[in-house]
Amino acid sequence: MTPMRKTNPLMKLINHSLIDLPTPSNISAWWNFGSLLGACLIIQTITGLFLAMHYSPDATTAFSSIAHITRDVNYGWMIRHLHANGASMLFICLFLHIGRGLYYGSFTHLETWNIGIILLFMTMMTAFMGYVLPWGQMSFWGATVITNLLSAVPYIGTDLVQWVWGGYSVNSPTLTRFFTLHFMLPFIITALTTLHLLFLHETGSNNPLGIPSHSDKITFHPYYTIKDILGLLLFLLALMTLTLLSPDLLSDPDNYTLANPLSTPPHIKPEWYFLFAYAILRSVPNKLGGVMALMLSILILTTIPALHTSKQQSMTFRPLSQFLYWLLITDLLVLTWIGGQPVSYPFITIGQVASVLYFTTILLLMPTSSLIENYMLKWT
């Protein structure tokens, strides 16, 4: 008799996605981050829902409602810190997931890759809005500085900023709309994640060798379900260690001070996962130019499939490209460090050099190195 999972319309969907899914037999631990991102999304949604039950999106009560959650709600401190550190863990998994896609050439699956970039944008938007909600000093000034960038848009810039703010400054209307969007966006992200998976299962997963693996595939369950559970346990160990032993390690002390429009913090900066883009923004002296560089630092990912000049999909057997790949990763780490430093010499110069190197590596050096490798292997 045919198992129910193969006949029931609902179970058939789950079966084709998680149980009988044909999967390459040689995918490594770098392929674990997709499932970890799914776990992150579930954790963030659940903790976020519990926080929303006690949160008050108003400039006069937001800060005290966070204090109330932390002090008076049962396990409120834990839910709050799980949510804040869960965002950091989500971005770590997200960056590693994108890094794996770049290294092993997963960007050749165009629909999956482009939906992934949209997901990255939406996750960044959601995280930024979430950072504003505690209504501390860094929340307020971060919101003021980042939303002010819209004023760089020609003709409609000023009107656009006031429209986003809901007034002439960041205040209660801004907080209310940010809370609404922060609540709504994760559900759109969940829908897009389903699309991301749908397109991935149309083409099948890539593998470390970057070669077709149709002749050697195994079922997802039990092999990769066990592997994903191990990854999930290690992920939960890291998240709980961070949350229980050092919950404020990745947050800013300024956010424990109530937002004050009359007092500017000495150094305004976003959360650590935005620092690389913030450094690129600051390295351009012109406001509009900076905003464009900021957008391009993420949008450049859409050009990667077009810039792929190698005859090989993966970087596994391409030492020159590997060197440039790790140069790019190092450059991003330097940009992250610079984004957290004050705007003074020598940090300005280092940031500008690192920003130029970031774009040059992706747009020029990597495609050129691929052509050199093709020539050396006589694959021209």
UniProtKB/Swiss-Prot annotation:
Keyword annotations from UniProtKB, A to Z: Electron transport, Heme, Iron, Membrane, Metal-binding, Mitochondrion, Mitochondrion inner membrane, Respiratory chain, Transmembrane, Transmembrane helix, Transport, Ubiquinone
Top-level taxonomic group: Eukaryota
Alphabetical list of CDD domains matching this protein: cytochrome_b_C (cd00290), Cytochrome_b_N (cd00284)
Cofactor(s) this protein cannot do without: heme b
Subcellular location, record wording: Mitochondrion inner membrane
Binding site for a ubiquinone: H201
Subunit description: The cytochrome bc1 complex contains 11 subunits: 3 respiratory subunits (MT-CYB, CYC1 and UQCRFS1), 2 core proteins (UQCRC1 and UQCRC2) and 6 low-molecular weight proteins (UQCRH/QCR6, UQCRB/QCR7, UQCRQ/QCR8, UQCR10/QCR9, UQCR11/QCR10 and a cleavage product of UQCRFS1). This cytochrome bc1 complex then forms a dimer.
Additional free-text comment from the UniProt record: Heme 1 (or BL or b562) is low-potential and absorbs at about 562 nm, and heme 2 (or BH or b566) is high-potential and absorbs at about 566 nm.
Family recorded in the similarity comment: Belongs to the cytochrome b family.
Record-given protein name: Cytochrome b
Protein species of origin: Pongo pygmaeus
Gene: MT-CYB
